[in-house]
Amino acid sequence: MVAGVIALSVVVGAPVLAAADNAITIPVMSQQDGAWAGAALGSSPTETIGSAGCAITAVAMMLRYDGIDTDPARFNAWLTGNGGYAFDDQLIWGAVTTYTGGRVAFSGWLGPDLGLIQAELDAERPVVAEVQLGGNQHFVLLTGDSSGGGFTINDPWFGDSVRFSDRYGDPSTGILSIRTFMPAAPPAPRRGDRDGWLASAVAAVRLAQ
């Protein structure tokens, strides 16, 4: 997590280009949004969502994409009241499964496996990635591929969508670890429902003749 305020000049060099063609479209959320930035992160006496809420903000973006109506403030409040943090403000990743009632399940805490990341993105499952920002632990949401090559990200600290390499360098060294999540598959239609629909359709055609 990004602890404390980091001067933007630490990581901002040349202007970054907006994420492009093959990225999953996920609206960006900023951990520094005034609607929640000042809220205490978990039960921490010092950290706030704005200073260290990158992980929950990245997860909140992913959950919104998967149809869960949430934001960093609501997610943080639930985690705080339901044992979703360790050591005051460290996200327990498996709590995501409980929070969503199993609609989105935490499926892995893994090393920087670029092949797995690509497979997840190809399956339209965004990936939470651990990086370093100004010497501090930070989390971003990998959303797809850029037309210029490499991964695209939604970055909670900056509240923008950019190419990973423009901000954090080569993914093979810039990604320290990943967290993966599996949305529940929508229920398949029951055979009876399908047969009933077909019967109704046939009857409608006959009536129209």
Give residue ranges: language-model regions.
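Extracytoplasmic/secreted proteins, especially bacterial periplasmic and envelope-associated proteins
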Residues: 53, 57-61, 74, 91-95, ...
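Active-site-adjacent substructure of cysteine-protease-like catalytic cores
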Residues: 44, 108-152
